[in-house]
Curated annotation (Swiss-Prot), chain A:
Belongs to the ATPase A chain family. One of its GO terms (cellular component) is proton-transporting ATP synthase complex. Keywords: ATP synthesis, CF(0), Hydrogen ion transport, Ion transport, Membrane, Mitochondrion, Mitochondrion inner membrane, Transmembrane, Transmembrane helix, Transport. It is a multi-pass membrane protein. This is ATP synthase F(0) complex subunit a.
Curated annotation (Swiss-Prot), chain B:
InterPro entries: ATP8_metazoa, ATPase_protein_8. PANTHER family: ATP SYNTHASE PROTEIN 8. Keywords: ATP synthesis, CF(0), Hydrogen ion transport, Ion transport, Membrane, Mitochondrion, Transmembrane, Transmembrane helix, Transport. It is found in: Mitochondrion membrane. Residues 35-55 are annotated as: Disordered. This is ATP synthase F(0) complex subunit 8.
Amino acid sequence: MNLSFFDQFSSPHLLGHPLILLSLLLPALLFPSPGNRWINNRLSTIQLWLLHLITKQLMIPLNKNGHKWALMLTSLMTMLLTINLLGLLPYTFTPTTQLSMNMALAFPLWLATLLTGLRNKPSASLAHLLPEGTPTPLIPALILIETTSLLIRPLALGVRLTANLTAGHLLIQLISTASIALKPILPTVSILTMAILLLLTILEVAVAMIQAYVFVLLLSLYLQENI
Amino acid sequence: MPQLNPAPWFSIMVMTWLTLALLIQPKLLTFTTTNPPSKKPSLITKPTPWAWPWT
C-alpha cells in the first residue's frame, strides 16, 4: 500500500515495448512545422510569440558568443514544457519524472558549457573557482568548496526537476485519494478537499512551467560563466 | 521508488536526444519571426517617368 502511490512513476510497458518512447515523441506534435507559404493563424501566432519571448529572456544576460546556444536552449525549454504540461493530464506518464532522463539531459549540457569555457577562455573559467577578495588562509578550503559545487551542478539540475515533478504528482494523487475516501464518511470535508485539489492543480500547472524554465535558465547561467 | 531506477538509461538518453535534435529543433527552426507592427506608413516611392531614346 505504501509503495502503490509510487507506481504511477514506473515506466509503463505495452506488449513488451516501453511507452516512454511514445510519451517522449507525442508532445512534439503540439508544435507544427510551418512552411513558408502558411497563413498565420491564432495558434501559430501565439506559439511564435511564446518562442520569441523565451528566446529573448534567455539571451538577454548572455553576450554575443552565447547566442549560438539560442536554438538549443529554446528547443530544450519547449520540450520540457510540453512534456511537463502533458504529463499533468490524468492517466498519463511523465518522462521528466524519471531521474535517468533528466540526468541524460543535464549532464551532457552542463559538460558542454564547462568544456566551452575551458576550451575558449581557460583562465577566466578557472577563476570562477575562487571568489574575488578571499582572505589568504581561506583560499584552499574555498577552492575545494567551489570545485565541489561546480561538480555537483548536473546532479542538482537533474534531481531538481525530478523531485519537483514527483512531489507534485504525489500530492495530487494523495489529495484526490483522500477526497474519494472521505466521500461516504464526511461529504463536506470531501468537497473542501476537492477545492484544495483544484487549487493544487493550478499550482502544479505553474510548477510544470516554472521548472522547465528554471532548468534552462540555470543552464544559461552556467553558460554565462563560461562564455 | 521506480522513478529513481536508472534501468534503461541508455535508450532513454538516446531517445531523448534524438527527439530533441531531430524533431523539436527542426520544428522550431521553421518558425520565422515577423516584424513588430509599426504605425509609420510605409514609404511610397514615386518613380519619375522618362522617355525612351528610340521613341
